[in-house]
Swiss-Prot record:
Organism from which the protein derives: Danio rerio (Zebrafish)
Family the entry assigns: Belongs to the COQ10 family.
Top-level lineage group: Eukaryota
Quaternary state and interactors: Interacts with coenzyme Q.
Mode of membrane association: Peripheral membrane protein
Name of this protein: Coenzyme Q-binding protein COQ10 homolog, mitochondrial
Subcellular location: Mitochondrion inner membrane
Taxonomic placement: Eukaryota, Metazoa, Chordata, Craniata, Vertebrata
Amino acid sequence: MAEKATSLFLRAMEISEKQSFDVMRRNSSCTIRHLSSCGILETRRVSLPPPPSASSQMVPSRSFINLTAPLIMRRMEYSESRSINYSPEQMYDVVANVEQYQQFVPWCKKSKVTRGRNGDMRAQLEIGFPPIVERYTSEVTVIPNHQVRAVCTDGSLFNHLETLWRFTPGAAGQSCNVEFFVTFEFKSLLHSQLATMFFDEVVKQMVNAFETRAKKLYGTGVHRQQASLRRAI
């Protein structure tokens, strides 16, 4: 019985191998190119692949900037607080003087107040870090010596941009607590990806620029403490 089973098994293997050989021989006749007797490649029948179905369409590739990032716009936020040896009035004057931004704010090429001078105002700003140069309009509202708020109302760069500065008296003499908050969302996916890469460095340089401006105008102040929070939503 065992010998018969073995014989049947071997026979089945032979048949299987023969069928496989026949399939391979038939497939070889469909080869795109064959070597002719003269040794020259000669083109034969070519079967074109079927057109791709809807389910197999190629998915557009993501930006080369960040291949793992989702193809969506992201609103980004940053907040920071500092206690420094300048009065609330001094820091307020630095931040509220929007027309002077072009002199000390990084990447600010032009800054011009187009409406209002003391108190609430409208300003046009031009920012640029090559190859990007953009203009936008900002509505600035203030609470003298306490708060400066700016909101982008027109421009091709941002879907949303808002900055907020608050100044409160510090624990000692000529000092104050400065709170800074910014939230923004670019219209362009490319700009959004660039912001994700350089976000921390750009915002920190912006905040440092205002403290450096105060130092230039009022003398050396002491930077006492710093806390920052960043998140993208």
